[in-house]
Swiss-Prot record:
Record comment regarding domains: Lacks the C-terminal regulatory region which is replaced by HisZ.
Subcellular location: Cytoplasm
Top EC group: transferase
Keywords for the protein's UniProt record, in alphabetical order: Amino-acid biosynthesis, ATP-binding, Cytoplasm, Glycosyltransferase, Histidine biosynthesis, Nucleotide-binding, Transferase
Function noted in UniProt: Catalyzes the condensation of ATP and 5-phosphoribose 1-diphosphate to form N'-(5'-phosphoribosyl)-ATP (PR-ATP). Has a crucial role in the pathway because the rate of histidine biosynthesis seems to be controlled primarily by regulation of HisG enzymatic activity.
InterPro entries recorded: ATP_PRibTrfase_cat, ATP_PRibTrfase_CS, ATP_PRibTrfase_HisG, ATP_PRibTrfase_HisG_short
Name of protein: ATP phosphoribosyltransferase
Lineage of the species this protein comes from: Bacteria, Bacillati, Bacillota, Bacilli, Bacillales
Family: Belongs to the ATP phosphoribosyltransferase family. Short subfamily.
Gene: hisG
Any GO CC annotation of this UniProt entry: cytoplasm
Pathway assignment: Amino-acid biosynthesis; L-histidine biosynthesis; L-histidine from 5-phospho-alpha-D-ribose 1-diphosphate: step 1/9
HAMAP family: HisG_Short (MF_01018)
Record-level Gene Ontology MF annotations: ATP binding; ATP phosphoribosyltransferase activity
GO BP terms in the entry: L-histidine biosynthetic process
Length: 213
């Protein structure tokens, strides 16, 4: 039997889409896998172990080697800048990082305060735009900041834009498109390159197949 592979997966939508991809790639995951409340799930038939984590923590687990590979959004990779290999764009969980605000202030570059849970990405973006802003880090409900006068603009993940519209906000600038990526711990890749390459290859075939539809 080959070496066991530990995979860090984020809870939520990315988990569901990634599990579906793994099944399409031929990995036999049990039915209860999707609904399990366990944080560590063993799949001995495939020699896999899954760690279920918060999206922002996946890169930490992979960087420190407690997980060999992980599935993380590009937004997290840009924000955290961890020492991991990004080996495959899975092309799932598509969304974008964008700037938004109230209609009367969103386009006002004089608004100096920007609320976000991505302070590094936001700082870099506005620096490139030649804007001096004060970044206010929040951990959730970013859309609230302009409504209560905490910040003139926000930087956040946008999928359909429905949450922005429901709160009277408008998107003014797209920073970048976001998808989920397969990431690898550098040491794990040296020790388990064959099994990691096989997983990346099998998933890559699924990605290309979906693009061809």
């Amino acid at each position: 039997m080959g070496k066991e592979l530990t995979i860090a997966m984020p809870k939520g939508r990315i988990f569901e889409e990634a599990a579906d991809m793994l099944r399409k790639a031929g990995y036999q995951l049990p039915e209860e896998f999707d609904d399990s409340r366990k944080l560590i799930i063993q799949v001995p038939e495939e020699n896999l172990r899954f760690i279920l984590a918060k999206p922002m923590d996946v890169t930490t687990y992979v960087e420190h080697g407690v997980a060999d590979v992980g599935i993380a959004g590009k937004d997290v990779l840009l924000e955290e800048e961890r020492d991991v290999y990004e080996v495959l764009d899975l092309n799932i969980s598509k969304c974008r990082l964008a700037v938004a605000g109230l209609p009367e202030t969103a386009a006002d570059t004089v608004a100096p305060r920007v609320a976000t849970k991505y302070p590094n990405v936001a700082s870099s973006y506005f620096r490139e735009q030649g804007e001096q802003v004060e970044i206010i880090k929040l951990n959730g409900s970013i859309e609230l900041a302009p409504l209560i006068g905490l910040a003139g603009r926000i930087v956040d993940i946008v999928s359909t834009g429905q949450t922005l519209r429901e709160n009277g906000l408008v998107e003014t600038e797209k920073i970048c498109d976001i998808t989920s990526r397969l990431i690898v711990n550098p040491v794990s890749y040296r020790m388990k390159d064959a099994v990691i390459d096989e997983m990346a290859s099998r998933l890559s075939l699924i990605v290309e197949g979906e693009k061809a539809k």
